[in-house]
Amino acid sequence: MLIPRLDEVRRALTAFHFFNTLLALAFPVIRSTSLCDYVFAVEGNEQCEIDSREREILMFLLIILAWKGRKATNWMHYVNNIFLFSKIAGMFLFIRADILPGIIYILACLIVTVLFPEPVYNGPEQVTYFQGEQLFEELTRNRNTIWVIQFFTTWSPECRHTSPVFAELSQKFTLPNMKFGKLDIGRWAKEGERFRVNAHPMSRQLPTICVFKDAKEIARRPLVNDSRRAVPFVFSEENCVLAFDLLNLYNEQKEKKGAKAKKED
C-alpha cells in the first residue's frame, strides 16, 4: 500500500475524516470496552464482548480492505474505502447485536453523510477545463501540442479520487507544448460520444484519460475490450506515468521546444 504523503495527511484533517473515523471504529471499540454494557442489552450473566461470529466478520472486513488497498489510486482513496466498508460492516454488526443501537448507528451514518460530505480536491493544478466542442476545436487547431485529457463526471466517486493524481501529473509534466485538460461528459454527453467515452455507470469507463498527439488519440485508459467492457485500471500516479509514457513524451516535447527556441534565436 502507498505511504501517505504530508499533503495527503493534511487533507485528512477535516470533519469528514474525523466523524467517519469515529463511525468506522465505533463497533470494535464499544464492543471491546466497558461501554459495551451501557450500549447493548445483555441477558443474565452473559459477558458483553466481541463473540466468535463478530470476530470472523471483522477479519473478513480486514481481508476486503487489504484487497481494496491494491486497487486504490492513492492513500486518500484507500481511506475512503476503509470508511465505506467499515460502516457497512458496522451497520450489520450493530443490528445483529441489538436492534436499537443498530438503528441509532444507521441514523448517525446518514447524518454524517449529509452534514459532512467528502471534501472536493482544491489543490494546485495546471489543467484547462473545456466546455462543449472546445476540446475538439483545440485539438484540430493546435496540432503541435500534446494534450492529456481526463473525461469525467461530477457524480462519479472514481473521478473524484483520480483528481489529485491528475492534478499532480499536470504540475510535473506541463509544458507550453504539452498540456492537461478536462471535459465533463456528464454535461456534454455528445462530446463523450465523439471521443468514444461511455458515461453510463455500468460501463466502468469513468474516468477515462486519453493522450492526443497531432489531434490523434495515441493512448487511452481504461481500454475497452471487444464486448465493450472497460478493462480495470488503477489510476495511481506511477501507473499513469508508465501507461501514457509521460516521461518520454515530456522529454520529446521539451527537446522540440528547445530546438524551436534556438532556431528563432
UniProtKB/Swiss-Prot annotation:
InterPro entries: Thioredoxin-like_sf (IPR036249), Thioredoxin_domain (IPR013766), TMX2 (IPR039101), TMX2_thioredoxin_dom (IPR037463). The keyword Membrane applies. It is a single-pass type I membrane protein. A motif (Di-lysine motif) lies at residues 262-265. The chain crosses the membrane at residues 97-117. Residues 126-230 form the Thioredoxin domain. It is found in: Membrane. The keyword Transmembrane applies. Gene3D superfamilies: Glutaredoxin (3.40.30.10). Residues 1-32 form the signal peptide. PANTHER family: THIOREDOXIN-RELATED (PTHR15853), THIOREDOXIN-RELATED TRANSMEMBRANE PROTEIN 2 (PTHR15853:SF0). The thioredoxin domain lacks the 2 redox-active cysteines, suggesting that it lacks thioredoxin activity. The di-lysine motif confers endoplasmic reticulum localization for type I membrane proteins. This is Thioredoxin-related transmembrane protein 2 homolog.
